[in-house]
Regions:
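Conserved acidic carboxylate
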Residues: 8
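Two-component/phosphorelay signaling modules centered on CheY-like receiver
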Residues: 11-36
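Helix N-cap/capping motif at the beta->alpha junctions
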Residues: 31-40, 65-68
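Active-site beta3 strand of CheY-like receiver
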Residues: 45-58
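Short amphipathic alpha-helix used as the core "switch/output" element in two-component signaling
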Residues: 59-82
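Alpha4 helix (beta4-alpha4-beta5 surface) of REC/receiver domains from two-component response regulators
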Residues: 62-66, 70, 93-111, 119-122
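Short, conserved "switch-loop" micro-motifs in signal-transduction and mechanochemical regulators
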Residues: 78, 92-93, 116
Length: 130
């Protein structure tokens, strides 16, 4: 069964994403907002895709606060993890953000919160994993 790592700091969003991904997508789900943990999970091959919140309040890497854009850049610049599909999710979607976030981060997909079309969310992840 494919596994999706959810990188999110809001417990409600974690619950919602977990339910959508397990019920509709038949995925296993891992959750973390700890950067070292995220990098270790990705490098270990334990995840087939990542759902990455853009705005993370508690994530720190090398002593600095980092957001989902920066974590995605780190993952995409590493030979061992750059192949893992990453979908950015954000509640702060403004006109032009999608293209800007995708270009800056190197992520493979983007969806705004709240996730209204649950099946489209699952389908986007499945398509990237194919």
């Amino acid at each position: 069964m494919p596994t999706v790592l959810i990188v999110e700091d809001d417990p409600i969003n974690i619950r919602v994403f977990t339910k959508i991904l397990t019920k509709r997508g038949n995925f296993e789900v891992l959750c973390s907002e700890d950067v070292e943990d995220i990098l270790a999970i990705a490098a270990s091959g334990k995840t087939d895709a990542i759902v990455m919140d853009v705005s993370l309040t508690n994530s720190v890497y090398e002593g600095k606060s980092v957001d989902g854009i920066r974590i995605t850049q780190i993952l995409k610049s590493n030979e061992a993890t750059k192949h893992i599909p990453i979908v950015l999710v954000t509640a702060h979607a403004m006109q032009g953000d999608r293209e800007s976030f995708l270009k800056t981060s190197g992520a493979d997909g983007y969806i705004s919160k709240p996730v209204i079309d649950h099946q489209a969310f699952v389908d986007q992840i499945k398509e990237m994993m194919a």
